[in-house]
């Protein structure tokens, strides 16, 4: 009985002495879209006419309550836009040398089997570096011109922020 009482006291004191590590230990989180915004708060990204995808970096800076950078801060990202791969992703040209040491192309192999594969327009996860910087790449494609990409960032405690990016 005494052992049971000691065990109970130990377990209760252990439970009461534990800290809640889910508290928001950060002070500020500032996003930098690196885009101009209009009067309605929509950001505008000009799509490339020379490439299928337009790559663009979105950043955020996270600092604690003492204005120090927070390292290894986890952030999840998602977007409302996706695109689909066709049947052929690309090709490889096999080249060799002749007896005269001249390059010749003797075969082309097509990389297939990706038909219908869904491709997101945003990376999914990022962690802050030692400077508190978080980075995410978005990559809309030309066929999305005129659409609005809604980029959502989610982090600790169920917090989130959504940014509207018009694809021009």
Residue ranges: model-predicted function:
Residues 18-168:
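The feature marks long extracellular or luminal low-complexity segments
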């Amino acid at each position: 009985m005494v052992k049971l009482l000691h065990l109970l006291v130990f377990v209760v004191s252990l439970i009461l002495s534990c800290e809640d590590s889910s508290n928001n230990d950060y002070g500020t989180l500032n996003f930098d879209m690196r885009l101009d915004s209009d009067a309605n708060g929509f950001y505008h990204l000009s799509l490339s006419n020379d490439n299928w995808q337009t790559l663009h970096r979105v950043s955020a800076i996270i600092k604690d309550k003492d204005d120090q950078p927070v390292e290894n801060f986890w952030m999840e990202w998602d977007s409302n836009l996706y695109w689909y791969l066709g049947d052929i992703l690309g090709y490889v040209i096999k080249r060799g040398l002749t007896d005269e040491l001249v390059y010749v192309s003797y075969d082309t192999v097509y990389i297939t089997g990706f038909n219908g594969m869904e491709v997101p327009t945003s990376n999914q996860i990022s962690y802050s570096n030692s400077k508190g910087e978080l980075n995410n790449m978005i990559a809309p494609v030309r066929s999305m011109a005129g659409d609005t990409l809604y980029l959502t960032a989610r982090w600790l405690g169920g917090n989130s922020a959504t940014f509207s990016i018009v694809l021009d």
